[in-house]
Amino acid sequence: MASTDSARTLVAIPARWGSTRFPGKPLHLIAGKALVQHVWERCQECREIDDVIIATDDARIAEAAASFGAKAVLTDPDHPSGTDRIAEAAKSFPDHRVVINVQGDEPLISPALIDELARTLRADPAVKMITAAAPIQDAAQISDANVVKVIFDTQGDALYFSRSPLPYVRNPDPWPRSYRHLGIYGFQRSFLFQFVAWPPSRLEQTESLEQLRALENGTRIRVVLTDELSPGVDTPEQAAAIEKHLTGK
């Protein structure tokens, strides 16, 4: 598990104790392991990553991380987002030029997707920020505000993200392919610190989508396409569904 060039790469997994809907979620057991341990183990399978850390606001999560061999960094409990949390944690790793933010509630995240984001950032320092998207297969998701849509240009850079349908379809025959945004981000280290230094932007606050802060400030976001969806865990019921998938029971 190491990058093949001089640009060291860090994966940071934000893990917050105080989820409104699911307190203590990172330590919820799924098939005998904490949720955050599943995410960490998937990241350990990556071939392009030098270090994986868990950025947390709670000593209980840090202690659990140590018990299964993970590095944990305790951060300010009052960060407004996971990106702010990983930015604080990344300060402890000054030799890492690339930082990947892997959501702490996606136990089936694809190691290959993480590697692809890391490779792209290392190969082209002009790409300051990167994320991923997948084709929407269920038409109902196009109008679902909980499914964030993205449109991008011919170079693969995002034009806009929205909870509304993107694009608006005036003539539905044929219906154009729509893409859902996946909540994984990668940053050039220097841009990560620039991003969290900017105040929340107008569109970001309107849509409640922090990636719009980058677009409003004139920064392109590269979008990597994938067919591998990684369901998140927001409720105990979703955790039970993941356990059933993992155990076949």
Regions found by a protein language model. Give the residues of each.
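N-terminal glycine-rich phosphate-binding loop and ensuing alpha1 helix
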Residues: S3-A55
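Short phosphate-binding loop-to-helix
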Residues: I53, A59-R119
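Hydrophobic/aromatic residues located in beta-strands of well-ordered beta-sheets
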Residues: V11, V52-I54, V99, M129-I130, ...
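Short, high-confidence coil segments that cap the C-terminus of an alpha-helix
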Residues: I49, D95-H96, D124-V127, T219
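Conserved core of the sugar-phosphate nucleotidyltransferase
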Residues: I109-S201
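Conserved alpha/beta core of the MobA/IspD/sugar-nucleotide pyrophosphorylase nucleotidyltransferase superfamily
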Residues: A2-T4, P176-K249
